[in-house]
């Protein structure tokens, strides 16, 4: 099993403030992101990645404890596998192509060759109902744009897809604080596109 790996410690990132938005209407990633593999790129106003092998693109902003995240996601691959990480450490990445131990929660739609969607607390291959919750009844349709909305309030993490509750996860010891305060885009092999990222702090 490959542990998430952190290289040299990065300077402390600024807080989110009340909100953060990114429509990717530019040519380069810019200073707001840390690319752990050097393969993330912006094409025609959208963020694109494939073959990242669990090397995230981290947003250089610290998340508040309670937060709402919205974004549009599309896969051009039949394998689906659209993925983000939240409340991670902002710098870790997989050292090899073995099982990945994330530093935060992993949210994935159409993972494992489009057979499973899940919320996982660090362990993508963890115990159902303990480390993760999942469903197998939904397949990602290639080239279809999905709108994701994720809410973390207290011990509850809720994930909505196109306005409908998709999965929820209850965590008695929610990840938060230093080492668990960043958002990241992630990927295995699929050709995935992201757009219209919005992150907003919620009241306690």
Predicted regions located by residue number:
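Secretory/extracellular carbohydrate-interaction modules
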Residues: 51-122
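Beta-strand-rich interaction surfaces with strong enrichment in secreted/lumenal proteins
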Residues: 55-61, 134-140, 183-184
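C-terminal motif of bacterial Sec signal peptides marking the signal peptidase cleavage site
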Residues: 6-7
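Extracellular glycan-recognition surfaces and repeat-rich motifs
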Residues: 27-53
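Flexible glycan-contacting loops in extracellular carbohydrate-active proteins
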Residues: 169-195
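Short, aromatic/His-centered strand-loop micro-motif at the edge of beta-sheets
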Residues: 124-147
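Short tryptophan-centered beta-strand motifs in secreted/extracellular beta-sheet-rich domains
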Residues: 24, 69-71, 144-153, 157-159
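Extracellular carbohydrate-recognition regions
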Residues: 10-36
